[in-house]
Amino acid sequence: MKKLILYTLLLTISFSSAQKKELRNANKFFTSGEYASAIDLLDSSKEIFDSSDDKIKSQAMLLYGKLHTAMEDFELAMNAFDMSKNLGISDQLLNPEISKLETALITSAVGDNETENFSSAAKKLKMVYDLNKDNNEEYLFYAASSAVNSLDYPLALEYYEILRDIKYEGIETKFYIT
């Protein structure tokens, strides 16, 4: 019986260190800019992470989100950050990454508007709104405007109806120091 308990304990410890090692290696690939290698490593270790505790899973999903943000695959980044949040990662770790995702989405949407790819810009601006619905209402308005420019009137109407439902008026108060 003692051997069985000892064997189980050793197996658990080695399994836990393998998870952390894979996560560390993927993080090294990320910091060196080898995003595809990091994703491949995380994907190949998916079974290891699936059987791990929520803390390791949330760290893996946070890394997935960071990788997809860097690769401008914004929908997958949003999904990864959402899963990480649901698994209980701290807001202190998650909020800076969500801010980076917002910035990347806005920059990409502005680029799409400049190249007259209004449909893509509308979707990206809607994603910015979805990230923080309380503070990013104006981006939903911009998304609706981009949808109008892309001649996607049903989508624009949907966005304008959401704006009406949340009673968005577009009025801002700005304070100036004189």
Language model region names:
Residues 50, 89, 133-134, 168:
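Short coil turns that delineate tetratricopeptide repeat
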Residues 25, 64, 101, 108, ...:
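Structural register within alpha-helical repeat arrays
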Residues 60, 94, 138-139, 172-175:
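TPR alpha-solenoid repeat register
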Residues 47, 86, 129-130, 162-165:
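Conserved structural position within tetratricopeptide repeats
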Residues 6, 17-103, 114-115:
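N-terminal leader/linker segments that initiate helical-solenoid repeat arrays
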Residues 4-13:
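Sec-dependent N-terminal signal peptides
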